[in-house]
């Protein structure tokens, strides 16, 4: 059994026991949260597709980690003008462990 869920403006395919990184969600490590934006649910030959989401379907996940990704460097330069701008960015993320999928 697996499901397609939407969180943080992106869609993820999840199954029980999976661990994935999503955009930062509020909560502490160990907290449980429900992902209710379930777009599709597949259980063997039984396929349910929402329009756009499935009613009464949810995915229960546990927050495994709150962290920040690797630093990326943004560097801008104008030739011959002496203009240089260096900027760094680290995106915050939440690591989730999928515990249960229910319909």
UniProtKB/Swiss-Prot annotation:
Source organism, top-level taxon: Bacteria
Subunit structure: Part of the 50S ribosomal subunit. Contacts protein L20.
Keywords attached to this entry: Ribonucleoprotein, Ribosomal protein, RNA-binding, rRNA-binding
Molecular function terms from GO: rRNA binding; structural constituent of ribosome
GO biological process, one term: translation
Similarity comment: family membership: Belongs to the bacterial ribosomal protein bL21 family.
Species of the source: Desulfotalea psychrophila (strain LSv54 / DSM 12343)
Lineage, uppermost ranks: Bacteria, Pseudomonadati, Thermodesulfobacteriota, Desulfobulbia, Desulfobulbales
Protein's name according to its UniProt entry: Large ribosomal subunit protein bL21
GO cellular component: cytoplasm; ribonucleoprotein complex; ribosome
Function: This protein binds to 23S rRNA in the presence of protein L20.
């Amino acid at each position: 059994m697996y499901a397609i869920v939407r969180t943080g403006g992106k869609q993820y395919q999840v199954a029980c026991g999976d661990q994935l990184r999503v955009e930062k969600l509020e909560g502490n490590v160990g907290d449980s949260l429900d992902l209710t934006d379930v777009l599709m649910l597949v259980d063997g030959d039984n396929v349910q597709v929402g329009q756009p989401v499935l009613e009464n379907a949810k995915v229960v996940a546990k927050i495994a980690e709150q962290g920040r990704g690797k630093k990326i460097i943004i560097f801008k330069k104008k030739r011959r003008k002496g203009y240089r701008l260096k900027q760094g960015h680290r995106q915050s993320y939440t690591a989730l462990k999928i515990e249960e999928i229910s319909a």
